[in-house]
């Protein structure tokens, strides 16, 4: 009679439809990267305040007539940015900045549909269920929150300011990147590629790298919001100092305001975090040599990307933030984050519960 000879536990992530889910999530991640870059262009061209209202539905249509364009221009002329920075701007010049902001918002709507419609389809077909369904639902809700945060950011520049709050800009950028990392992590967890078991220290530093990249992205958002990259355009010295005088770093009172509002301190922090990230990535790659194989390869690829990103940041700084270098630097940040997330997923990503496989032998 047949009896059970052996039980083998496998981690099966090749269930029906999961490959399509993985491709869908990676496609949405690519759209988010495009959104971050377009958002950077919108900021660098000072286009972000050209649309002064938030209309999630009707705002999808651009002005269709001369009267519509004039109405939008009239609204822009009523805010401080026009009065202080762009007084005398003509309608054609306004159209150029309007299209950047409109395109940024349109891409946000596209991402929403690109996520929601396949999500509903996969859920209806039963491909998304259990923890995977819950994760995707959380991702969708985070996307909705990101849209609201975007308007919250824009609204900060429609009152007495001529630009958006650096606090809100940094939050908006960082939340986009958190969503990007989360989507990539979920997609990676569905890969049939096996994970390599490594020591706790290597896993811990992989987690730390993802966290530190996000901290650096937040710091970069503060630099962008304060236009801090337009000053102190030398490297490795800042205004002739490797470490600026304490009186300048702590010029504002109370001290914590310097961390967010003092352009010198904000740029200095961005530099110091970059050095820390580069050092940690190098140490992690050296540690990964003992694991060998794909783990070591990914760690060294990540180190190369961090090195390239730091070099690009230096070039952007010393050339006083030209738009092409600035956008490449922003794209590089998302690329580093994606690779760090994929690397972490290859070490300790979430997997589906083990499925027992029984082999029956006649006896």
UniProtKB/Swiss-Prot annotation:
InterPro entries: COX15/CtaA_fam (IPR003780), HemeA_Synthase_type2 (IPR023754). Its EC number is 1.17.99.9. The chain crosses the membrane at residues 18-38, 107-127, 137-157, 167-187, 206-226, 264-286, 299-319, 325-345. Its cofactor is heme b. One of its GO terms (cellular component) is plasma membrane. GO terms for molecular function: metal ion binding; oxidoreductase activity, acting on NAD(P)H, heme protein as acceptor. One of its GO terms (biological process) is heme A biosynthetic process. It is an enzyme of class 1 (oxidoreductase). Pfam families: COX15-CtaA. Keywords: Cell membrane, Heme biosynthesis, Iron, Membrane, Metal-binding, Oxidoreductase, Transmembrane, Transmembrane helix. Interacts with CtaB. Catalyzes the conversion of heme O to heme A by two successive hydroxylations of the methyl group at C8. The first hydroxylation forms heme I, the second hydroxylation results in an unstable dihydroxymethyl group, which spontaneously dehydrates, resulting in the formyl group of heme A. This is Heme A synthase.
